[in-house]
Amino acid sequence: MRLEDLSRVPAETKAAVMEIVTLTKNRSGWRVYRTLAALGVPRSVYYAWKARERLEDRTGKPLRVYEILAEERAAICDFALQYPKIGYRKLTWMMVDAGVVCVGESTVYRVLSDADLLSRWKRSVPSSGEYNFRPKAPNQQWHTDVMYVWVAARFYFLLSFVDAYSRYIVHHKLLITLDGRSVSTELQAALETVEGVKPRVVHDHGSEFVNRDVAAVIKTHNLIEIKTKPRHPESNGIVERFNATVRDESNNDYGDNYLQAEGVIARLMHHYNEERLHATLGYMTPATWHRGQPDEVRRERARRIAAARTNRKTINQQRFKQAA
């Protein structure tokens, strides 16, 4: 059995395809995509069929002019297959921002649930050990820490300064040596990236932070220094979670030498700041919040969803008229 024309497939044929996929998976262990490839059915088409309330192309149900289009369902399923580890909420706003499909979270949830494509993502658990201070604007509080990076049979040290309000990486440096002088130099560099700010600086009790060089920079700029609880990394949870993200997205592969490692980390930082959507930021990027633009993004997203809804109404009305 091989389908040549997918533009108009009878309901019984669709049902047969789904039955074949299920039986083949149960009896031989073949994955869905392998069976679909043998049948000549694209995965996006299959999941669009599966997501429909009924298999018939034309139904007798009441006309709903704002009903999601079949091609939008297929696009949502196809997008989810490209990002299998990402939850539906983040997928929703990734698609809206990229102009793939502009619908709300509940619609994406229903489509993916019907297609059995909901990602079972790991829910983050807020740390009970973080300090109660909650910044209300960028650069009121920075968190800093060092992450060990293994490259070419030795360790380097990734020093990062994370803005607590926006999760933006204000400054980073891959250090060759880890000491007070190196850290104080990079703290000074971080302060120079945003002139006139006096953030609270949160760090652990490591000797690279607790020393005369770092203390001198803090005193010169009249900063408030916050030391976390000893042997309690959760107290610095914001930067700890960032470090975990770097490890996860790099797969701990930073290249074969220091210069390659710098390049890998620079790309990761750009992706983290400018592209990666954060649940705690309303599924926006750290750069959006650090630049004070979340309201602009909210308005643009609302505009896109409204425009897509109007377009969906027009298309549905045309199709209903043609089907009459």
Predicted regions and their residues:
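Acidic/histidine-rich, metal-coordinating catalytic segments
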Residues: 178, 195-211, 236, 283-287
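RNase H-like polynucleotidyl transferase catalytic core
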Residues: 200-205, 219-238, 252-258
